[in-house]
Each structure stands twice: as C-alpha cells, then as structure tokens.
C-alpha cells in the first residue's frame, strides 16, 4: 500500500504540487491523469525518492520515503517519462548491466532475464542492439529494466506516449497483465491511453487533486446536464417559443434555421428524460422530426472541465 499525505513541492515561489493526499492499495492499477505541467512527473519523482518533497509524507506500508529511501527503491520498478536506454548495448547486455547494479548475478540473473523476457515479450529482440528496436519495443525494454528485480510496485511515467495505436494497445495489455500481481501507478495526459487499463483515475490540475475515483464514480459525481439537439421541419415560431411552458423539464438554449430546417437545442437534468414529451409536443404542432440526439457528459468532457493550463515547471 502507498499512502501520500499532504505532499507539496515548491520550486522557489512556484507551487508545483500543493498538499495532495491519496492512497493506493495492493493489486490496484491507478491512472494519474493531468495536462502537461500539472504536477504528475514531480509527484512521481518524489514517490520514487528522486526528488525531496517540500513537505508531506510518502509511506510504503511501514516505510517512509525520506528515512527508508533505499529500502523502498528496492521494492519499486520505475519507468521515467524519458526512458533511459543505452542505445549501443544489446537488450540482454542492458538488462544484465542493470541487474548487476542490483547485485542480481549468475543463476539469479538468468532466472530474472528469462522472466522479464517472457513477461515483456522481448524474445524476438533480446540479442538486438537497442538502437535497432522500435519505440514500442524500447518501452518494453524500459519496463523489463524496471522489473528485473521483481518489484512489488510499478510506477510508470507516461508509458505509452509517442507510440502508434498498435503499440499503445500492446503496452496497455502488458500493463494490465502486470497489474494482476503488482501495484501499478501510471501517469498520462491523454485519457484514452489509460481509460481501459486502470481500476481508478486520479486527476491532477495545477498541482492539486481535483478528482479521484472509478470511471463510474467520476461520471456520477461530475456529469452535468444533458444537451438535446433536435432538427425539425415545419415548426412555427410561436410553437417554438411556447415549448418551455408545455415541457417545463427542458430549458431552451438556441435556435438556428437553415433551408427550412430548424435546429433547436435544449438542456435538461441528467436524471430527467423529456424526449417523449417533446415528441408528443412536436406531433401536436405538426413538426416533422428529422433528428433528436442527446449528448451526455463523458469522461473526456469531465477531464476538460476539471483541467486548465498548468504551470510548466511541474
């Protein structure tokens, strides 16, 4: 379990992270979502012991990141946003080098190498130079490097950014598989990259946590009113003017007319559905309905509403 309490980081007068608190349970895959510069990387660097907080606590079970940095780092596999690979090395040489730093040698290294090659799908490139591998494979190599010591926790900073759609699907599938056995905390600035992968989403904006929950919980907590777009023919102006009096559950928003087609927009509450009443009113007033399309808030809308331009220092 990871417990973050009142965590802050200042760069001079700039508050990159502002007293954030959250918990992550073992076995969870949690997405950390925010615009560029919102504070994601700063938070991850503090959690992995590479950046000292200005204030607050980060605890891994009974260990504190300040007092027990090296012990915690033994339990963490960290993939930074800029994947630190030695391009001139072969894949197995790079993994052997990193394993050696962690004092994993001999038979233990062979077992660890075999495990990460299998888990990360590297069998076809293990003897290739890293420079000759595609970006998707380089991300897999970075994941293998983060996992060579079989950590309980994976912290991944934008692991699928810059990959093509097929590579994104592959890496997401790999992360989901790894999440069955490990705690995974991964950041992104693109909702679609993590939505189908994680159990829970936290949204950070300008250094503050502005949302935290499952997709369903976020939809329930932040979903706004429904916008209904209607296209009709033959609607007399006075019948449009009177519609709100006849169907009080809707709010008239706008009217545009083009080539005898009226485009009318209404708004109503998420717990209401006035479409039958609107249809009945249209029939009574001899409208021809061409289209009736509701637009409900989705996670992308919620993300856009909750995030604004952040400070680039974060």
Predicted feature locations:
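ABC transporter nucleotide-binding domain
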Residues: 173-265
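Residues that scaffold the ATP/ADP-binding catalytic core of kinase and kinase-like folds
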Residues: 68, 146, 218-221, 302, ...
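Short, charged/small-residue-rich alpha-helical element at the C-terminal edge
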Residues: 227-299, 306, 314
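ABC transporter nucleotide-binding domains
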Residues: 2-4, 9-205, 209-211
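Generic structural signal for isolated residues within well-ordered alpha-helices
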Residues: 71, 97, 115, 217, ...
């Amino acid at each position: 379990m990871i417990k973050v309490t009142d965590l802050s980081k200042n760069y001079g007068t700039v508050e990159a992270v502002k007293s954030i608190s959250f918990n992550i349970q073992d076995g969870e895959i949690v997405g950390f979502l925010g615009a560029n510069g919102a504070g994601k990387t700063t938070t991850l660097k503090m959690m992995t012991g590479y950046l000292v907080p200005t204030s607050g606590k980060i605890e891994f079970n009974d260990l504190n990141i300040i007092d027990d940095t090296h012990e915690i780092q033994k339990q963490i596999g960290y993939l930074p946003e800029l994947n630190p690979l030695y391009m001139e090395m072969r894949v197995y040489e790079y993994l052997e080098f990193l394993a050696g730093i962690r004092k994993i040698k001999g038979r233990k290294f062979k077992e660890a190498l075999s495990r990460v090659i299998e888990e990360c799908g590297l069998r076809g490139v293990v003897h290739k130079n890293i420079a000759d591998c595609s970006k998707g494979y380089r991300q897999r190599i970075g994941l293998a490097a983060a996992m060579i010591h079989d950590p309980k926790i994976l912290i991944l900073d934008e692991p699928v950014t810059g990959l093509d759609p097929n590579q994104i699907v592959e890496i997401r599938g790999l992360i989901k598989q790894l999440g069955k056995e490990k705690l995974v905390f991964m950041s992104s600035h693109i909702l679609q990259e993590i939505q189908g992968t994680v159990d829970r989403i936290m949204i950070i904006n300008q250094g503050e946590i502005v949302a935290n929950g499952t997709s369903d919980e976020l939809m329930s907590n932040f979903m706004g009113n429904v916008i209904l777009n209607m296209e009709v023919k033959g609607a007399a102006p006075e019948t449009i003017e009177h519609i709100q009096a006849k169907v009080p559950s809707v709010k008239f928003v706008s009217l545009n007319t083009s080539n005898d087609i009226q485009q009318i927009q209404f708004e109503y509450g998420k717990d209401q559905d006035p479409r039958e009443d609107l249809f009945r009113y249209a029939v009574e007033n001899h409208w021809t309905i061409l289209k009736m399309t509701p637009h409900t808030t989705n996670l992308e809308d919620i993300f856009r509403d909750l995030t604004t331009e952040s400070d680039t220092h974060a």
